[in-house]
Every structure is written in structure tokens, then in C-alpha cells.
């Protein structure tokens, strides 16, 4: 960790660090927590997209965003989560433990965002033909981060996240910017 911490190019409060996925067995299971502890107090927005202990161990360090899916959220609390109201209930429990914002993906059932300022957003999944769900969750995180940096608005970040994740699921590979923008245009047209 000493090497990782000394090599990070994080400079200021506008930086975002995304900690995502599993870690090799040879690494300590506290790796994400150790990184967050090392960066504590620098005002960096840290996003964590991981499962089980990798996710729950970081909550004390108040990550800017965590992104479990509904099944992972249920595993954390030992329950089965089947609807968006349950997602909101348990997302708030993660906030009580330290998460600032909780974005929960629900595959074809959409997504939910519970924000640090008390807003709750629910979305159905955009319509499209599923081609490849690999990377859709990572794409959702990338879209959310991009949308938040661009707008400093949770609703816009949520829309970008949902549309980016969905566009990737509707693509053979990861979505392109035009594919994401086309879904956002559809979303905005449908809501007007």
C-alpha cells in the first residue's frame, strides 16, 4: 500500500478515485479500506463498486458513492430485495453506516439512487435488446461520475449512469458516446 499511496496522482478536491471489482487473493481484504484511510481528509470523491467486505469495510471512511446491485445489497443485510422500495430502505441503512450516496443497479428492473442530501431517484431500465451485460455496472459508475463532474447534479448523474450502463448492455462491447447520448435523448424526450 505504501507504493500505491505514494504513486497516486491525486492532486486536489476535484479528483475522483474509483475502486472497483475484486482483488487478488494475495492482497489483503482490507485493501480498499487501507487506500481510503490513506487518502482520508484530502476531500477526494471516492467511488466503491465492490462486494461484501470490500464494500462494507470502507463505509467508515464515507465514500462519495457506492454501487452494489440489488442482490449484493441483499447479501449485505441477509435479505432478498425484490423492489425499489426495499432498495431505498437498505440503501439508507448503508448511508447510516457512512456511505454518502448509494447507487443500486437492478439489471432489467432499473436502478435507484439515494443521495446524501435526501433525494431519492428511481428509474426503470431503458428499452433495448440485451446483447452483453458484462461491464454494464462499471459503465453505470463511469456514466454517473461523468454526469456528476459535468453537472454537479445528482439527477443528471443518475440519468447518465442509467443510460451509460444500459447502452453498454445493448452493445456487443462497451457503449460509445453516441450510443449513450442517443439513450439520454430518448430518456429526456420520454420525460417531457
What are these regions (language model features)?
Residues 2, 62, 98:
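Conserved functional loop/turn residues at catalytic and ligand-binding sites
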Residues 16-85:
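Conserved beta-alpha-beta core of the PfkB/ribokinase-like small-molecule kinase fold
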Residues 37-38, 56, 84-192:
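Conserved phosphate-binding/catalytic region of the ribokinase-like
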